[in-house]
Swiss-Prot record:
It catalyses: a (3R)-hydroxyacyl-[ACP] + UDP-N-acetyl-alpha-D-glucosamine = a UDP-3-O-[(3R)-3-hydroxyacyl]-N-acetyl-alpha-D-glucosamine + holo-[ACP]. HAMAP family: LpxA. Keywords: Acyltransferase, Cytoplasm, Lipid A biosynthesis, Lipid biosynthesis, Lipid metabolism, Repeat, Transferase. PANTHER family: ACYL-[ACYL-CARRIER-PROTEIN]--UDP-N-ACETYLGLUCOSAMINE O-ACYLTRANSFERASE, ACYL-[ACYL-CARRIER-PROTEIN]--UDP-N-ACETYLGLUCOSAMINE O-ACYLTRANSFERASE, MITOCHONDRIAL-RELATED. This is Acyl-[acyl-carrier-protein]--UDP-N-acetylglucosamine O-acyltransferase. One of its GO terms (biological process) is lipid A biosynthetic process. It comes from the Bacteria. Belongs to the transferase hexapeptide repeat family. LpxA subfamily. It comes from Xanthomonas campestris pv. campestris (strain ATCC 33913 / DSM 3586 / NCPPB 528 / LMG 568 / P 25). Pfam families: Acetyltransf_11, Hexapep. The keyword Acyltransferase applies. InterPro entries: Acetyltransf_C, Acetyltransf_C_sf, Hexapep, Lipid_A_LpxA, Trimer_LpxA-like_sf.
């Protein structure tokens, strides 16, 4: 939308109960329902629908045809009040869908700050997405998935319900995971979702020095290459964690698992 264009296109439909900051822009044929709150500097492109209860922060961009805050796609949902919360600085591309939570799943779907969600991404009910993530085209998160910060998910990849994807992980194109993906881990580009080393390039880009990356590589080899039972691998990781906050975070992620760890 150009600077000289009207802030609210005359074909947009905005419920009187919606609360929009004074500089929010809304494009042609978009619908914003009741109990929607949108912060300053946010742009809603054409043909978007935003349903409440939904809270959206500042400086977000919904490019067009996005469906935000719709009812969860869960047969157990019975109309209870649930919500979607989106942070600041996110870019939501064409035909992205993000659903509200469910009463049985915590009641809230959360998207953090500075994420990029490319065309046809789907974020299901009760998902919790961190900050600085990139979801490529057709990324699919089933219900209750948790995604850490700086995660990159390639096109046509997805995660089974209740899975966790740790910070700085990378899922290759078409990767499907039905288990927890530890932080820093790369998942191969196939439907089996096999681990394929650590995300070294991504870590370098984010300022991890050689010493930190070396400690993470050692932890990965302990977990995936040494052939150890998980219980024994965790004991060795506990020793390594004494000298590395990154390994300590990796071990804490493993200890908190409720689903099987991807191995």
């Amino acid at each position: 939308m150009r600077d000289q264009a009207p802030l609210i296109h005359p074909t947009a439909v905005i419920d009187p109960a919606a609360r929009l900051a004074s500089d929010v822009r809304v494009g042609a044929f978009s619908l914003i329902g009741a109990d929607v709150e949108i912060g300053a500097g946010t742009e809603v492109g054409p043909h978007c629908s935003i349903h409440g209860p939904t809270r959206i922060g500042s400086n977000n961009r919904f490019i067009g045809h996005a469906a935000i805050g719709g009812e969860p796609q869960d047969k157990k949902y019975a109309g209870e009040r649930t919500e979607l919360v989106i942070g600041n600085g996110n870019v939501i591309r064409e035909f992205v869908t993000i659903n509200r939570g469910t009463g049985g799943g915590g009641g809230i779907t959360v998207v953090g700050d500075d994420n990029w969600m490319l065309a046809y991404t789907h974020v299901a009910h009760d998902c919790h997405v961190g900050n600085h993530c990139v979801f490529s085209n057709n990324t699919t998160l089933a219900g209750h998935v948790t995604v850490g910060d700086y995660v990159i998910i390639s096109g046509f990849a997805g995660a089974h319900q209740f899975c966790r994807i740790g910070a700085h992980a990378f899922l290759g194109m078409g990767a499907l995971t039905n288990g927890d993906v530890p932080p820093f881990t790369m998942v191969g580009s196939d439907s089996l979702g096999r681990p394929r080393g650590i995300n070294s390039e991504g870590l370098k880009r984010r300022g991890f020095d050689a010493e930190r990356i070396s400690a993470i590589k050692r932890a990965y080899r302990t977990l995936y290459v040494a052939g150890l039972p998980l219980a024994e691998a965790k004991l060795q990781l506990a020793e390594q964690a004494r000298d590395s906050d990154d390994v300590r975070g990796l071990l804490e992620f493993i200890e908190a698992a409720e689903r099987p760890l991807l191995r």
